[in-house]
């Protein structure tokens, strides 16, 4: 069963449009959501969070739409963004009390355990927390709830490597029982390389590609060499050619590598390279 099902989603804004967005996340998986600034990532997330309504289409979390059961739908989602969403003046102990009142599934003991693990002071004003401390607090709140879908929107931006690595481990634990899933929107594509199971590319309001990460990485290769050594036929296989000091670099489909000889160097790509070359080619 899928935790998230988005079907034919459309939304028109003043100068932007989400068009026929479709995506699913199976239970127990992490989906990376990537695209350039303004591609439609946050707009899509706002619709899933029901911050605004779609013009047409449907969204279901664990089989439930907002129209079916608004309370259950909202309780099924946990969200961490790039800004701390706690009101100025609050302390950790205030956050705990508020969450107990709002979420029936909130686990106070787990929250206390995470606050201790993250070494967060319970009586210090949150406004005086560092960026890393605020992010840890937000993660402590969502990890202490029984939400089916965790949405991360640039949540790991600006974190030091130690904190980021710690949180990557926590995210994998979050889904390990196979009953929860994560939608992870980030510009830190190295994070997705580490933990994502699926990758979704969005550009100009359209979902361009949604595939298992490992499958996608196998389907493409990076090719490098002297552009002058290419035949006209070989040039047709290149995706998003970039000129470098040593020659050229481009993306090709792996099954086209047989059409090149030993004058060229082939490397396995990462998610960032696939995205950048396909954008340059105009395929996204």
What is each model feature region?
Residues 6-9, 16-26, 33, 57:
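Conserved beta-strand
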Residues 35-40:
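Walker A (P-loop) phosphate-binding loop of ABC-type ATPase nucleotide-binding domains
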Residues 49:
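Helix-to-loop junction immediately C-terminal to a conserved catalytic motif
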Residues 57-68, 72-73:
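Conserved ABC transporter NBD signature motif
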Residues 75, 81-138:
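ABC-family P-loop ATPase nucleotide-binding domains
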Residues 150-154:
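Catalytic Walker B motif of ABC-type/P-loop ATPase nucleotide-binding domains
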Residues 238-284:
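C-terminal coupling/interaction segments
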């Amino acid at each position: 069963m899928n935790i998230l099902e988005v079907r034919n989603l459309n939304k028109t804004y003043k100068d932007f449009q989400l068009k026929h967005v479709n995506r699913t996340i199976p239970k127990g998986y992490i989906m990376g959501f990537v695209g350039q600034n303004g591609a439609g990532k946050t707009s899509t997330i706002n619709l899933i969070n029901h911050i605004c309504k779609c013009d047409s289409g449907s969204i279901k979390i664990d089989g439930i739409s907002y129209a079916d059961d608004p309370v259950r739908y909202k309780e099924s989602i946990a969200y961490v963004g790039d800004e701390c969403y706690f009101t100025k003046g609050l302390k950790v102990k205030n956050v705990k009390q508020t969450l107990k009142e709002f979420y029936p599934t909130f686990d106070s003991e787990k929250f206390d355990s995470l606050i201790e693990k993250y070494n967060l002071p319970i009586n210090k004003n949150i406004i005086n927390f560092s960026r890393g401390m605020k992010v840890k607090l937000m993660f402590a709140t969502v990890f202490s709830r029984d939400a089916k879908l965790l949405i991360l929107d640039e949540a790991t931006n600006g974190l030091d490597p130690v904190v980021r690595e710690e949180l990557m481990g926590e995210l994998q634990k979050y889904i390990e029982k196979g009953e929860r899933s994560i939608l992870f929107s980030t510009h830190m594509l190295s994070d997705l390389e580490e933990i994502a199971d699926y990758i979704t590319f969005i550009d100009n309001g359209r979902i361009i590609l949604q595939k298992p990460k490992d499958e996608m990485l196998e389907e493409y290769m990076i090719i490098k060499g002297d552009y002058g050594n290419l035949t006209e036929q070989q040039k047709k296989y290149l995706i998003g050619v970039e000129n470098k000091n040593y020659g050229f670099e481009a993306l090709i489909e792996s099954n086209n590598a047989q059409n090149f000889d030993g004058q060229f160097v082939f490397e396995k790509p990462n998610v960032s390279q696939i995205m950048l070359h396909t954008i340059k080619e105009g395929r996204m």
